[in-house]
From Swiss-Prot:
PANTHER family: MAP/MICROTUBULE AFFINITY-REGULATING KINASE (PTHR24346), TESTIS-SPECIFIC SERINE_THREONINE-PROTEIN KINASE 1 (PTHR24346:SF102)
Protein name in the entry: Testis-specific serine/threonine-protein kinase 2
Subcellular location(s) of the protein: Cytoplasm; Cytoplasm, Cytoskeleton, Microtubule organizing center, Centrosome, Centriole
Entry comment describing in which tissues the protein is expressed: Testis-specific. Present in mature spermatozoa (at protein level).
InterPro entries: Kinase-like_dom_sf, Prot_kinase_dom, Protein_kinase_ATP_BS, Ser/Thr_kinase_AS
Keyword field: ATP-binding, Cytoplasm, Cytoskeleton, Developmental protein, Differentiation, Kinase, Magnesium, Metal-binding, Nucleotide-binding, Phosphoprotein, Serine/threonine-protein kinase, Spermatogenesis, Transferase, Ubl conjugation
GO MF, one annotated term: magnesium ion binding
Bias (Basic and acidic residues): 302-315, 329-349
Species annotation: Homo sapiens
EC code(s) of this entry: 2.7.11.1
UniProt-annotated binding residues for ATP: L18, G19, K20, G21, S22, Y23, A24, K25, V26, K41
Length: 358
């Protein structure tokens, strides 16, 4: 029985193809019960690697059935056929994903970015409060509804945090996500605190929102990692970003995990509060080199050498950020990263997975 027939029997009239990944495909469909269009992700167990089926897929389905938040894509129904095809019926992001939106519209005004980022941060806090981590936060996984509200999607690498006998979160050893959004500790294959990893990815996302470009050039991972570990963040001068916005990004892109912000600190940050009548001017910054700044506004920053890379790393016509999944026993990333280049559709859940533990 083909997909259209299976779905028709369940009350869904199949529409267009939305995307296809290594182990999943996504179609639009009209729900006769809900009376509106939905997205249907279809995964065939027989065509999917064992590690994905046994580890990542059950986690994703468990978490999709658990989460319920206004800024997270809704899951309406999950069912499976006798021949091993899984159908996940989800809310449809009718305006596409955030990356395509920014590539079309350019950098967002801070007021627009503030609204969207507050929605995203609220969704992440909801997950973290449930001890759920996403581990693949990126613009492609942020869908937009008809009113351009953020909807977090793709929980393919998500997991529930494990805790030891003292209640402390056990470090993760599955080094997953996309290289351009991955924290330094993940790039180095250092066991990491998964909630803190999500925060770094949030920093990259906010930078893209307000700058319209990537904060780091991931075409050279070694060089990118060196720049990140020096806590160097360049902001395009032409964007005239406020002091508070730069400060929030800088604190999220903190290579020292003990100093990186937590989600509650992000939500309480001054930049995410309702704007004051008179916004803080960014004119008090003293810049050096290619947009790197020295703070005169009580920012937690430090001066450094002139950057040897240029800011304003363009967003490509197609997103091909390397997907990382490194086995538990791998050592350092630089020589052993299992890098797979692909254009990942914003609806398609995690693919190309390797052996992993937590």
């Amino acid at each position: 029985m083909d997909d259209a027939t299976v779905l028709r029997k369940k009350g869904y009239i199949v529409g267009i193809n939305l995307g296809k990944g290594s182990y999943a495909k996504v179609k639009s469909a009209y729900s006769e019960r809900l009376k509106f269009n939905v997205a249907v992700k279809i995964i065939d167990r027989k065509k999917t690697p064992t590690d994905f089926v046994e580890r990542f897929l059950p986690r994703e389905m468990d978490i999709l059935a658990t989460v319920n938040h206004g800024s997270i894509i809704k899951t309406y129904e999950i069912f499976e056929t006798s021949d091993g095809r899984i159908y996940i019926i989800m809310e449809l992001g009718v305006q596409g994903d955030l990356l395509e939106f920014i590539k079309c519209q350019g950098a967002l005004h801070e007021d627009v970015a503030r609204k969207m980022f507050r929605q995203l941060s609220s969704a992440v806090k909801y997950c973290h409060d449930l001890d759920i981590v996403h581990r693949d936060l990126k613009c492609e996984n942020l869908l937009l509804d008809k009113d351009f509200n953020i909807k977090l999607s793709d929980f393919g690498f998500s997991k529930r945090c494990l805790r030891d006998s003292n209640g402390r979160i056990i470090l993760s050893k599955t080094f997953c996500g996309s290289a351009a959004y991955a924290a330094p500790e993940v790039l180095q294959s250092i066991p990491y605190q998964p909630k803190v990893y999500d925060i770094w990815s949030l920093g990259v996302i906010l930078y893209i929102m307000v700058c319209g470009s990537m904060p780091y050039d991931d075409s050279d991972i070694r060089k990118m990692l060196r720049i990140q570990k020096e806590h160097r963040v360049d902001f395009p001068r032409s964007k005239n970003l406020t002091c508070e916005c730069k400060d929030l990004i800088y604190r999220m892109l903190q290579p020292d995990v003990s100093q990186r912000l937590h989600i509650d600190e992000i939500l309480s940050h001054s930049w995410l509060q309702p704007p004051k009548p008179k916004a803080t001017s960014s004119a008090s910054f003293k810049r050096e080199g290619e947009g790197k700044y020295r703070a005169e506004c009580k920012l937690d920053t430090k001066t450094g050498l002139r950057p040897d890379h240029r800011p304003d790393h363009k967003l490509g016509a197609k997103t091909q950020h390397r997907l990382l999944v490194v086995p538990e026993n791998e050592n350092r990333m630089e020589d052993r990263l299992a890098e797979t280049s692909r254009a990942k559709d914003h609806h398609i859940s995690g693919a190309e997975v390797g052996k992993a533990s937590t």
